[in-house]
Amino acid sequence: MENLNLVSLPHFVNVENLDVEEVEALIKRAEYFKKGGATPRLTTPVYITNMFFEDSSRTHTSFEMAERKLGLIVIPFDPAHSSVNKGETLYDTSLIMDALGVNIEVIRHSRNEYYNDLIDLKEHQHLNMGIINAGDGSGQHPSQCMLDMMTIHEHFGHFKDLKVAIVGDITNSRVAKSDMELLTRLGAKVYFSGPSYWYDKEFDKYGKFEELDKLIPDMDVMMLLRVQHERHADDPNEKAFDAQEYHEKYGINHKRYEELKPDTIIMHPGPINHDVELSGNLVESKKCMFVRQMQNGVFMRMAMIEAVLRGRKLGGLE
């Protein structure tokens, strides 16, 4: 059995509530699982459901794989055939799941901070289940953030003074918001690039906005973000968007790839728009961590779920 402090949490909805020691412990635990370390022995059944109200392939499947590796009983939930379509609120849906015996909900929702309705309960409310945030609108994406931290740590062994460039549709990216905050606390130096109209001045407290080609030779990590067309309904820049022009200005092409330092890594939360954020034939290149991020996601989500199991004393864990 590995010797480390095990994290206990009642919910896992953002990374801001984690201290650095908890982040480091979760990374070590995920690395332990990846190396084939034993999963905790559950002495009583634990029921979990994945409620994804936005499209997902990687995150949904990754969570379910993590749940099954931990020995949890996964209860199917399909929002397209649920009473949500009849006007049922998220709270009422969760109340029903709680009454049926579900212990933990993994939720992705289009509304920012939807989870507050489920964990900041009023005196007359008695919902009693763990909530794991799989992404809330353009707000936070804690599991993607944590698997990103694991991937960086796995490659470099530390965070202090690493130079990380976050590039692309930053304003609409929940991944960027989670990552920039945590990277800064872990001691990395954050930089931003991409279209200025998808950058908000509120991010200045985390790092400096620069032209991409100025950053390329000095960065340790290039974190590329998907252009989120589905969140641009009221954005006048969407009509003028040109994929080839974006790739030339803000994408990693072969020329920029060759200008990166030998040890630099490229990351992307997926799905990748080929030949927009990244040249399609670089997706499986040596520097690109896209596949490794997905692999690491299963083990990090195992660590996150285990933290909630322990925090809620489920499965006989404490």
UniProtKB/Swiss-Prot annotation:
UniProt binding sites for carbamoyl phosphate: 58-59, 108, 141, 144, 270-271
InterPro entries assigned: Asp/Orn_carbamoyltranf_P-bd (IPR006132), Asp/Orn_carbamoylTrfase (IPR006130), Asp/Orn_carbamoylTrfase_sf (IPR036901), Asp_carbamoyltransf (IPR002082), Asp_carbamoyltransf_Asp/Orn-bd (IPR006131)
EC numbers, comma separated: 2.1.3.2
Record: residues binding L-aspartate: 86, 174, 226
Alphabetical UniProt keywords: Pyrimidine biosynthesis, Transferase
Pfam families: OTCace (PF00185), OTCace_N (PF02729)
GO biological process: 'de novo' pyrimidine nucleobase biosynthetic process; 'de novo' UMP biosynthetic process; amino acid metabolic process
Any single Gene Ontology cellular-component annotation: cytosol
Source species, domain of life: Bacteria
Listed GO MF terms: amino acid binding; aspartate carbamoyltransferase activity
Catalytic activity: carbamoyl phosphate + L-aspartate = N-carbamoyl-L-aspartate + phosphate + H(+)
Keyword Lipoprotein: no
Pathways involved: Pyrimidine metabolism; UMP biosynthesis via de novo pathway; (S)-dihydroorotate from bicarbonate: step 2/3
Reported function: Catalyzes the condensation of carbamoyl phosphate and aspartate to form carbamoyl aspartate and inorganic phosphate, the committed step in the de novo pyrimidine nucleotide biosynthesis pathway.
Annotated family: Belongs to the aspartate/ornithine carbamoyltransferase superfamily. ATCase family.
Subunit structure: Heterododecamer (2C3:3R2) of six catalytic PyrB chains organized as two trimers (C3), and six regulatory PyrI chains organized as three dimers (R2).
NCBIfam families listed in its UniProt record: asp_carb_tr (TIGR00670), PRK00856.1 (NF002032)
Protein name: Aspartate carbamoyltransferase catalytic subunit
